[in-house]
Swiss-Prot record:
This is UPF0416 protein RC0826. Keywords: Signal. Belongs to the UPF0416 family. It comes from Rickettsia conorii (strain ATCC VR-613 / Malish 7). Residues 1-33 form the signal peptide.
C-alpha cells in the first residue's frame, strides 16, 4: 500500500508539473474557490492588463505605420518622374530630348 501511495503522489506531481497550463488553472481555480474576493481582483487586474496592452499596441502600431508611410512618401516624392528619365531604345543609345 505504501508503494501505491508513493506512486500515486509521484504520478500526480509529475502530471501537475508536466502541464503548466493545467497546473496554473488548478491553482487559480482553487484560489478563486477559496476566496471570492480574489475573483474580483483577478478580473480587475486582467481587464486593466488587457486595456494597457491594447493601448500600448495601438500607440506603437500607429507610430510604426506613420513612420513607414512618411518614409515611403519621402522616397516617392524624390523619385524622378517618368518624363525626367532618359529613354533607351532597343539598340542601347540614349535618346536626348
Amino acid at each position: 500500500m505504501r508503494i501505491f501511495v508513493k506512486a500515486a503522489i509521484s504520478t500526480a506531481a509529475w502530471r501537475f508539473y508536466a502541464h503548466p497550463t493545467v497546473a496554473m488553472g488548478i491553482c487559480v481555480g482553487t484560489a478563486l474557490a477559496y476566496s471570492p474576493e480574489n475573483t474580483f481582483e483577478l478580473l480587475k487586474n486582467t481587464t486593466y492588463t488587457g486595456i494597457e496592452a491594447a493601448k500600448f499596441a495601438y500607440e506603437n502600431t500607429a507610430g510604426i505605420v506613420n513612420g513607414i508611410a512618411g518614409l515611403a512618401h519621402l522616397v516617392y516624392d524624390n523619385l524622378p518622374s517618368y518624363s525626367e528619365t532618359p529613354q533607351v531604345d532597343l539598340v542601347g543609345s540614349i535618346e536626348i530630348s
